[in-house]
């Protein structure tokens, strides 16, 4: 057989692909993982049964030098770790095949002490933070002023500006991720049996939540909290009046464009950045900062962490705690309340 190393390597990749297919992982996830393994193979110019821990260290240094985010490095490490795990699993024959054909066997080269996941609990940038209440209000005021300006000037785009303003408010009022927001359909507006006066604006059924482990998108219902009931009139106006003026026809998307299509994620990012800059807010604030703001503000309102975790769809409570960044005013209120209870308790004991 010509170049047996190449044929065995390709067979390994094909076998790993089939294993992931059988687990129901998304095709895009599988392609991304295979691409990482091929890239590592090309970088080392070695076949898997020749890989070493030092190869991973050098590869990591290379991608970090190219200013890759820590989350990207972690994804690379995870892909390599899972591939090596597959090769060294005794349920498969790769160890026996390699020993028989090449007198070497694959080994796990991604270990706890040379991977990002072991070193870093939080991989976000230190400059990322939630918006304060004042910044949220400033952002929404600027978005609303866009609508008024376009209406008063007689220029086109007022309906689109109204849609954009309500979309940003929805991201904040429900703590949504970007994809979760743009993939909403009109049918995803739901009632809250406890607050019938809100009609179908009491909850959102999120069908495109972040997938776990490369599987299908998860689903959850996010309840509107009373502190954000200001969201209802604007949403009612969009759904019952403004949206129909885009002539969506049979299109089920909640957020439609002038061309009768669903809004894109890229558009939402760009529009947030434009409105943020118009509002003279810090450039390090991103659309995802609104989701961080939601978690922080619900915590300051006094909601239980478990409730907040369910609302935002976090698998682990630790992720929710990372999102939270309570204000100094909130900390002072909590401290004042604790001191008051302590003083009252001491006076009662006298």
Regions found by a protein language model. Name each.
Residues 1-350:
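Conserved catalytic core of the tyrosine transesterase superfamily
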């Amino acid at each position: 057989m010509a170049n047996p190393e190449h044929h065995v390597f390709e067979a390994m990749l094909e076998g790993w692909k089939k294993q992931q297919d059988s687990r129901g992982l998304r095709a895009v996830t599988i392609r991304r993982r295979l691409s990482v393994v091929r890239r590592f193979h090309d970088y080392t110019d070695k076949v898997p049964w020749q890989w070493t821990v030092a190869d991973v260290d050098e590869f990591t240094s290379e991608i970090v030098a190219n200013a890759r985010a820590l989350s990207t490095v972690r994804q690379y490490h995870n892909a390599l770790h899972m591939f090596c795990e597959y090769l060294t699993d005794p349920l498969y024959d790769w160890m026996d095949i390699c020993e028989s054909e090449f007198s070497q066997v694959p080994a796990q080269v991604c270990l706890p002490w040379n991977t990002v996941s072991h070193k870093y609990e939080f991989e976000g940038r230190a400059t990322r933070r939630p918006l304060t209440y004042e910044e949220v209000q400033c952002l929404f005021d600027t978005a609303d002023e866009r609508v008024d300006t376009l209406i008063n000037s007689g220029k086109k785009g007022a309906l689109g500006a109204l849609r954009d303003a309500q979309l940003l408010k929805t991201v904040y009022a429900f703590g949504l991720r970007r994809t979760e927001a743009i993939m909403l359909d009109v049918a995803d507006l739901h009632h809250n049996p406890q607050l019938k006066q809100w009609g179908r604006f009491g909850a959102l059924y999120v069908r495109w939540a972040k997938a776990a482990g490369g599987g299908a998108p998860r689903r959850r219902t996010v309840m509107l909290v009373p502190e954000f009931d200001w969201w209802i009139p604007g949403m009612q106006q969009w759904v019952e009046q403004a949206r129909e003026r885009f002539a969506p026809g049979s299109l089920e998307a909640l957020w439609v464009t002038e061309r009768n299509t669903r809004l894109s994620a890229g558009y939402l990012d760009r529009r947030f950045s434009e409105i943020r800059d118009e509002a003279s807010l810090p450039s390090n604030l991103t659309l995802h900062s609104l989701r961080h703001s939601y978690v922080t503000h619900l915590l300051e309102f006094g909601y239980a962490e478990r409730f907040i975790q369910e609302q935002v769809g976090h698998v682990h409570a630790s992720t929710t705690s990372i999102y939270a960044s309570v204000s100094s005013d909130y900390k002072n209120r909590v401290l004042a309340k604790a001191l008051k209870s302590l003083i009252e308790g001491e006076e009662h004991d006298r």
